[in-house]
């Protein structure tokens, strides 16, 4: 199966702040249960979406504008601390005593930088297409790569390094069609003895086995 591509989301928050006494930048890189319109669909992040990636002690970086050369901290060294709270993904960056670190602290204090973003891969998601023209994607589990104070927001429709919202929706709907194709024979087998349509759990299991088969054959 192809590896999931990186996606980016940005939240503008008044609470992104610089704590002068210990040179720390504090803010939420993600907010739970906030519906964001991405153009082709709406999206929200479920509480607990970051729980596994944090428990796995992934070496997450703190960057400026998602640039690898603009490193501000990392969890491995203890200069970046991440935790889920009632609001979302809280980040605390112990800013470096460098030109970038000092300048960024000044910009945050002045209010010139007031947004934070995060880079991730979607691991588990749910879709609600009760309104096909306005579907909702819920991120249930993500793999976190970096958090970043940003100058400009990075959304899938505007950032060329991320999957577009249109492609994400198309991939989801293609997956649904694949699932339907796999379970059609199952439905036919059951129809002779049982008129009950297989539930989503059955469909998902059938799709998982078929994908495993394709991986082995590939």
Feature-to-residue mapping (PLM):
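Charged/polar low-complexity intrinsically disordered segments, enriched in acidic residues
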Residues: 164-218
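Catalytic zinc-binding patch centered on the HExxH motif and its immediate surroundings
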Residues: 73
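Residue microenvironments linked to proteolytic maturation
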Residues: 10-19, 24-26, 61, 79-182
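Short glycine-rich, polar/acidic loop-and-turn segments at beta strand-coil junctions
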Residues: 29-33, 64-68, 95-97
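Polar/acidic, low-complexity leader/linker segments enriched in S/T/G and N/D
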Residues: 1-58, 190-203, 213
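Solvent-exposed, flexible loop/coil residues
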Residues: 36-42, 48-49, 54, 58, ...
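Short conserved beta-strand and strand-loop elements enriched in small hydrophobics
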Residues: 58-70, 116
């Amino acid at each position: 199966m192809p590896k999931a591509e990186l996606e980016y989301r940005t939240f503008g928050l008044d609470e992104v702040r610089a704590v002068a006494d210990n040179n720390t930048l504090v803010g939420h890189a993600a907010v739970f249960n906030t519906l964001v319109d991405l153009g082709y669909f709406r999206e929200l992040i479920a509480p607990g979406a970051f729980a596994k990636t944090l428990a796995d002690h992934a070496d997450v970086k703190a960057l400026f504008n998602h640039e690898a050369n603009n490193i501000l901290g990392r969890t491995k060294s203890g200069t970046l601390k991440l935790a889920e709270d009632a609001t979302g993904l809280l980040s605390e960056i112990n800013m470096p005593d460098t030109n970038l670190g000092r300048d960024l602290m000044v910009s945050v204090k002045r209010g010139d930088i007031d947004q934070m973003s995060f880079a991730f891969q979607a691991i588990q998601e749910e879709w609600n297409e009760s309104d096909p023209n306005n579907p909702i994607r819920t991120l249930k589990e993500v793999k976190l790569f970096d958090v970043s104070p940003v100058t400009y927001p990075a959304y899938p429709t505007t950032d060329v390094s991320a999957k577009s919202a249109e492609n994400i929706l198309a991939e989801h709907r293609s997956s649904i069609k694949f699932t339907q194709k796999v379970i059609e024979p199952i439905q036919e087998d059951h129809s002779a003895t049982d008129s009950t349509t297989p539930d989503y759990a059955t469909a998902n299991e059938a799709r998982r086995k078929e994908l495993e088969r394709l991986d082995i054959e590939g």
